Every structure is written in C-alpha cells, then in structure tokens.
C-alpha cells in the first residue's frame, strides 16, 4: 500500500515490510500532512484481480482518532482470494530496524504508487516464457502509460529466485519517462541471464528470499 499526493493505491507490502505499527506511523503522518484525504481511505479493488485492500473503516471521523493504533480494523490489511489456486512462495521481506532507517524510510517517506502489470484477460503479471515474444507486452493493460518519471536515471531491482539467495541489481532507465511496456521489457532483459543461467545452489546458504 502506497500513497501519492492525489490518491491511495491498493497493495499490502508496506504492512508486510514494516509491520502494523510502523505502517500506521506512515499513514498517520500522511494524513496529518494533508497528503491523503480520509474519503480516499475506503476499500479499493485492483481491476481484473481478486486483490482488495482495506485501510480505515468508513466511520472514521474527519479528525484523526487517537485509537488509530488500536482499531481492530487495521489500516493496512490485505485480502487476497486465490480463486484459481496456485503456488505460494514464502518471502522474508526487509524491514527498517535502525532509528535512522525508520525516520528516513517511514516517518519522512513519501512512497510512489506501485506499478501493476495486468496482461491479456485480466491476469496479473506477464510470464517469463513469453517475455521476449512482443505479443504479451503489447497486450499489457495501460502499456503506454508512463511509470517512472522521478528524475532518476536508475532503480534498484531486488529479485527472489527460489531457492537461491536474494539478488540485487541496478537497472538503468535513462532520464526520460518510461512506459509500463518498456519497463516490463527492461526488467526481463535484465533478468534473462539470471533465469537461463541460475547460480549453483549452495545448500549451506539455502534460504527463503
């Protein structure tokens, strides 16, 4: 779940990364700064998927309640209904532990909206097997929409390739805005060698990413 100055997105990784308390700190700060209105904190659904995010109950008054941290309706809940079944890969997600990281990455943070890749038929994601056949990227929902335009020329890409250790890469995008289609192609191009030539598995370091 991320905020922007104009709307609230629906994604639950913030709660998974920071835990309920730090997530509520972020939400509280965003509300107090006037960057998110309470009428935006309603259940939101990602079109074409079964993912629904719930943040604050609609009966919350305009003034920020002191009970925000104890409300039974946690403001960072995520409901995922796996209607079609499928594998679930457990992941160990990085959490900011130091006071400086919590201040810089939570209290003072202003996250950008998450970027979803919804393919043909409303399926969430694009398979690697079809990544370099241009048809899947042509059928991406909103493929021509701009994604990154933050004045940055590169982004960090963190990859969990089960059961190997987590890998981190720097992906250079240039200084122009990048469309969702171009971003998908760049990500797959960067990962191509990793998928086709995975590292040897060291049993001593086998872990959940």
Question: What residues fall within each predicted segment?
Answer:
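Intrinsically disordered, low-complexity regulatory segments of eukaryotic
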Residues: 2-172
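Positively charged alpha-helical interaction cores common to chromatin-/nucleic-acid-associated regulators
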Residues: 144-209
């Amino acid at each position: 779940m991320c905020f922007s100055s104009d709307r609230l997105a629906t994604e639950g990784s913030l709660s998974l990364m920071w835990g309920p308390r730090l997530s509520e700190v972020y939400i509280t700060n965003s509300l107090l700064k006037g960057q998110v209105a309470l009428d935006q904190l309603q259940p939101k659904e990602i079109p074409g998927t079964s993912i629904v995010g719930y943040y604050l109950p609609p009966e919350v008054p305009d003034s920020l309640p002191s009970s925000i941290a104890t409300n039974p309706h946690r403001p960072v809940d995520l409901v995922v209904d796996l209607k079609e079944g499928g594998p679930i890969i457990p992941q160990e997600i990085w959490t900011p532990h130091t006071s400086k990281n919590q201040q810089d990455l939570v209290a003072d943070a202003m996250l950008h909206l998450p970027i979803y890749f919804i393919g043909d038929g409303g399926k969430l994601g694009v398979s690697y097997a079809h990544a370099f056949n241009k048809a899947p990227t042509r059928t991406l929902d909103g493929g021509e929409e701009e994604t990154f335009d933050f004045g940055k020329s590169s982004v960090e890409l963190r990859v969990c390739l089960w059961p190997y250790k987590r890998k981190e890469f720097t992906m250079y995008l240039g200084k122009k805005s990048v469309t969702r289609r171009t971003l998908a192609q760049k990500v797959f191009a960067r990962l191509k060698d990793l998928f086709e030539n995975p590292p040897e598995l060291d049993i001593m370091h086998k872990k959940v990413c």
